[in-house]
């Protein structure tokens, strides 16, 4: 740490490198999500307050500032639940800072006491099967970059993995064969093994033989253009690139497609195919089936909309008389006041 670092910078460093991993025993992925929240907070300070990361002190970390950050984040298009997750991370940091900077315990406690906003039942955003197919097949597999991007999009959908799980896949996690399996390192440091489709298996086999034949088991399956481990921002960029490309030709294609939407789409398509919700729970790596039930509710809502859409057609098929043809009756009805 630089000798000129502020107390805020020092606390952030200790929070991420000591407190979370060693005292709270949080997983690497959880720590990364906390890091991302703090990066967003610093970006907010720079863009909205013209405060550089090197100029903020722990005494400046106040309730009003955090609330402004959350409003800025919501205005960027984030959901209430996403904002609540960011708030939870900042409150954990505030709790830690109280232990280290007791002289600022009062303003820090006011941050910890910010209440999360209540959100309506979560709406599941997903692509239809045809939309997903269009997106996955967009990259040009005749180039190395396009082939790599095709693998990323295909694997993210077919495995239903979280984006960080995709980043963490190593060569050893893939077991190619008549039935190809993939081992995923999920939340809570838990692993699950899933079966991939034959088409995805063939794509990965070709990708490894063409571009990753030199790789050993501990090497990452997906790398960035610098042949380093790809990160979540890199995958988000790839998704946006092809969505924007499609929308140049098809403005009806959804504009806001995020990485987690691949996971939502896979779950919805499995449900539509009649796959048991318990299997979907295990496939997605949900600890509690209530988390998976959000897809069941969404599927029921779609079915209800389909039924309602058919209702006018059924009514229109009934041979009701055309009262306009009976001028006398129409005049009589119009004369009633």
Locate the predicted segments by residue.
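Conserved catalytic core of the tyrosine transesterase superfamily
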Residues: 1-337
């Amino acid at each position: 740490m630089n000798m000129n670092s502020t107390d805020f910078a020092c606390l952030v460093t200790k929070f991420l490198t000591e407190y979370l991993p060693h005292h709270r025993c949080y997983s690497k992925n959880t720590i990364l999500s906390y890091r991302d929240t703090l990066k967003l907070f610093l970006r907010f300070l720079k863009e909205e307050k013209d405060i550089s990361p090197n100029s903020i002190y722990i005494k400046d970390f106040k309730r009003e500032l955090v609330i402004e950050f959350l409003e800025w984040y919501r205005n960027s298009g984030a959901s209430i639940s996403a904002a609540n997750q960011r708030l939870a991370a900042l409150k954990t940091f505030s709790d830690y800072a109280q232990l280290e900077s007791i002289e600022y315990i009062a303003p820090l406690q006011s941050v910890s006491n910010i209440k999360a906003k209540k959100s309506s039942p979560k709406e599941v955003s997903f692509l239809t099967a045809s939309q997903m197919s269009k997106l996955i097949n967009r990259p040009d597999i005749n180039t190395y970059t396009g082939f790599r991007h095709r693998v990323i999009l295909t694997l993210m959908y077919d495995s239903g993995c979280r984006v960080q799980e995709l980043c963490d896949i190593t060569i050893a996690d893939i077991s190619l064969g008549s039935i190809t399996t993939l081992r995923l390192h999920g939340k809570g440091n838990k692993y699950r093994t899933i079966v991939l489709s034959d088409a995805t298996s063939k794509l990965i086999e070709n990708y490894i033989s063409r571009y990753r034949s030199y790789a050993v088991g501990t090497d990452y399956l997906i790398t960035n253009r610098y042949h380093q481990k790809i990160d979540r921002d890199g995958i988000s960029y790839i998704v946006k690139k092809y969505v924007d490309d499609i929308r140049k030709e098809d403005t009806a294609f959804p504009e806001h497609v995020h990485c987690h939407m691949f996971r939502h789409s896979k779950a919805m398509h499995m449900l539509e195919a009649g796959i048991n919700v318990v299997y979907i729970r295990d496939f997605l790596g949900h600890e509690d089936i209530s988390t998976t039930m959000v897809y069941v509710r969404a599927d029921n809502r779609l079915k209800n909309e389909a039924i309602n859409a058919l209702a006018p057609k059924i009514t229109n098929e009934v041979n009701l008389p055309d009262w306009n043809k009976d001028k006398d009756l129409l005049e009589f009805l119009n004369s009633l006041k």
